């Protein structure tokens, strides 16, 4: 089992050129970021730094800096991970069927770098009906 590490992120700034190999991603990301973003891992529930985060701004992809969600789309879903009801604009998030762990889910990844973000569910409480359930480790934040 993966043990979360306390290693600080190696970079929080957007990259113009993305790593072209897994070795490049390993050099760019912390061990925990690599596990979640590149190996489709999941952080433990209720441990992420953005779970109770309430500042106004933009949640970005930790892998490439792409803006994914605005803070006004974030809500408390009581699921243990940050939740959002819509992406910042169509096309920044890619959805793929995920049949692992004996469940049928929809995986969400960053459309630019392919980094694993989490999953989207159709049980959201807002008018979109969606709940983008995202690992905090997959996210960065830009203040408004």
Identify the role of each PLM range.
Residues 2-4:
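C-terminal motif of bacterial Sec signal peptides marking the signal peptidase cleavage site
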Residues 17, 26-60, 66-144:
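A short Gly-Trp-Pro
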Residues 6-8:
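Bacterial signal peptide processing site
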């Amino acid at each position: 089992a993966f043990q979360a590490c306390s290693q600080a992120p190696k970079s929080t700034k957007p990259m113009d050129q993305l790593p072209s190999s897994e070795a490049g991603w390993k050099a760019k990301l912390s061990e925990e970021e690599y596990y979640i973003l590149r190996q489709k891992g999941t952080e433990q529930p209720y441990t992420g730094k953005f779970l109770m985060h309430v500042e106004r701004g933009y949640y970005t992809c930790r892998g490439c800096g792409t803006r994914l969600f605005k803070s006004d789309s974030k809500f408390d879903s009581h699921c243990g991970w940050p939740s959002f009801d819509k992406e910042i604009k169509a096309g920044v998030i890619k959805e793929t069927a995920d049949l692992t762990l004996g469940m049928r889910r929809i995986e969400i990844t960053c459309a630019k770098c392919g980094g694993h973000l989490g999953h989207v569910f159709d049980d959201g409480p807002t008018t979109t009906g969606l709940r983008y359930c995202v690992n905090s480790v997959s996210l960065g934040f830009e203040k408004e």
